[in-house]
Structures are given as structure tokens and as C-alpha cells.
Amino acid sequence: MTKRYWNIDLEEMMRAGVHFGHGTRKWNPRMAPYISAKRKGIHIINLTRTARFLSEACDLVFDAASRGKQFLIVGTKNKAADLVSRAAIRARCHYVNKKWLGGMLTNWSTTEKRLHKFRDLRTEQKTEGFNRLPKRDAAVLKRQLSRLETYLGGIKYMTGLPDIVIILDQQEEYTALRECITLGIPTISLIDTNCNPDLADISIPANDDAIASIRFILNKLVFAICEGRSSYIQNS
């Protein structure tokens, strides 16, 4: 994998609060190599390590995108939902930003059926098929469509399992991470000081609570994906 320069600036990371971990009582000892200090009762993340692993992750997604691979971004915290959808759409990635439905990947055949149902209902709505139904039946189908849009809207164009999954909060998205591990899907995960750094293929130590920190990491990854996609288009 070719190493590239991604302009990952330590001062910019500090301004985004990437270095702020959790309280010192709420930590995973396996995170010790990624912690540089304790300050006012919280752990401080070593940003040199963050920059190294973020750079590795950018190299990985660039290479994958330049070969036409598919990505799934998972971040279901309410405050990050809009950020996730905007970033994913910009990089033409699939995303889950509301709730991870158990078995979404490990029970892919069921997910496919839901996606087919979702597409059928969207077609019905666009062709005004609901207007030809009794009001009660139309209301039931509209509720179904609304629910499917909420939970599957970000993966509506997904036709198979993703090649790489980006997870923005290891603890919040633990079910998604376990499904990826079960299926052998490579993962990139943000890890705060209360996380296990050994679960993902590339773990990026960072504050996973502050929106500015999440935005900084995600923007770097999305930029690398977009650059890789441009390379793929030029070479195809």
C-alpha cells in the first residue's frame, strides 16, 4: 500500500478536541499506549499516534476507492447523524445514521428483502400508486415506507456486503463491529479511551463524543475516498 501525504495537522486536531479522552476512571487499560497524559481527571490522547493511524486509514480507503470498492459508514449518535449522511453522500458511500438493525450484514438475505420492499414502496409513491388505494391501506404503506426510509435510506443502493466499514463510535456501534468481524469485513474505527483497540483492523484513537473531533476524522477519510474514486474514474 503506497503511503501518501494527507495534511494531518496536530494543531488542527487540538482545536477540534480530538485529544480529549474520557475520565480516568472510565478507561480501557488496553488504550494505555495511545494515552499521553492525565489532565483534570481525564485522559489525553497521544495525537502523534492518532495522526499515524488516521494516515494509514486514509491510505487504505484511497487504495480501495481507486479499485472501485464499496464503503459503509456507521454513526448512529443523534448529534452526528447529519454529519454522517452529508459525508457519505459526498463520497458516494452507503451509511447508517439512525439505528443499526441487528443482522443488517450477517443476515444479508433478510436485509435484501427489506431493501426490495423499500424500493417497491418508493416506486409506488412516485407513481402515485398510494392514491389508488383505500385511505387506511395507503396510510399503513406510508408508515412502512417512512420506517424503511429512516433505517435503510442510507443503504438503499447497496447491492451486496460492503468492502470496508467505517465505524465512528466503537461502543455505540458494537453490534455492527461484531457483524463485520464475523464476516471478515475490514473495519476502520474511532476509539476513545474507554474502547478496545484490538477489535478493528485500523483503530484511530480520538475523541468520539465531540462533533468537531468526529468531523475532523471523517472529513479526512472522506477526502481520501473521493481522491481514490477520482483515480478509479480516470483509470477506467
From Swiss-Prot:
Recorded GO molecular functions are: mRNA binding; structural constituent of ribosome
Q: Where is the signal peptide?
A: none
Keywords, A to Z, come to: Chloroplast, Plastid, Ribonucleoprotein, Ribosomal protein
Question: What Gene Ontology cellular component terms go with this record?
Answer: chloroplast; chloroplast stroma; plastid; small ribosomal subunit
Spell out the SUPFAM superfamilies in the cross-references. Answer: Ribosomal protein S2
Which CDD domains does the protein's record reference?
RPS2
Name the GO terms of the biological process aspect. Answer: translation
Query: Which protein family is it in?
Result: Belongs to the universal ribosomal protein uS2 family.
Q: What is its main location?
A: plastid
This protein is called: Small ribosomal subunit protein uS2c
Checking InterPro entries in the record gives: Ribosomal_uS2, Ribosomal_uS2_bac/mit/plastid, Ribosomal_uS2_CS, Ribosomal_uS2_flav_dom_sf
**PANTHER family (UniProt xref):** 30S RIBOSOMAL PROTEIN S2 PROKARYOTIC AND ORGANELLAR, SMALL RIBOSOMAL SUBUNIT PROTEIN US2M
Q: Native species of this protein?
A: Arabidopsis thaliana
Tell me what gene encodes this: rps2
Q: Is Ribosomal protein there in the keyword field?
A: yes
Matching entries from PROSITE patterns are given as: RIBOSOMAL_S2_1, RIBOSOMAL_S2_2
The subcellular location is: Plastid, Chloroplast
